[in-house]
């Protein structure tokens, strides 16, 4: 915090640089983790450990892996004789209870159903993963591991107007116990799609026939080539 404009500007630039470096490190670690995962079979629980992973980003990388593969994910930073790991999970798998079953192998652990962390001696890594894999196979047996969205209301194009926003505001505050309403448009055309962001990972587009001037889909750039070559109709959740 600074009351001097010049100093505040320098501090803001420093924070922006740190954020950019953190994002780059997260992307690099995610790519490396995905390479190691795809080198084998994608199982009910995925993991990646490396000396190059910073302990400050392993949770972010694990979250990205869960988002992409919809599997419980463990990402760990190897620091000398020890591994410090972050876990992110899915609704169907209580990650901390799984770690509780492996407490004899861990130096420390803690968390809740969807996220946890632990420290383990690197000599016990393989034994730990084997045990966690048995637990994951047991708990997730027969479950269709595909991410789902619970749509509250499906709208018609002509219903997407500025008038819906005051109605949604009446439902605030949202959060645990009162999740935000999820709306959907199905089978709609998209126009003027562009890849945006420093890494071109987001999409910006228009929805013809609606009052939506512009929409942004974060981390959905994989659909750009499909739109460009096929011009399919899309289902949108927002």
Question: Can you annotate each of these PLM segments?
Answer:
Residues 32, 51-52, 79-81, 117-123, ...:
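A glycine-rich phosphate-binding loop feature that marks nucleotide/adenosyl-phosphate handling sites
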Residues 110, 168, 190, 231-238:
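OB-fold and OB-like beta-barrel modules that bind single-stranded nucleic acids
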Residues 156-207:
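Long, low-complexity segments enriched in small/aliphatic residues
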Residues 1-123:
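Hydrophobic helix-and-loop "lid/oligomerization" segment in the mid-to-C-terminal part
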Residues 39-43, 52-55, 67-69, 79-81, ...:
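Short flexible coil/turn linkers enriched for glycine and charged/polar residues
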Residues 210-228:
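Beta-strand/loop nucleic-acid-binding surfaces
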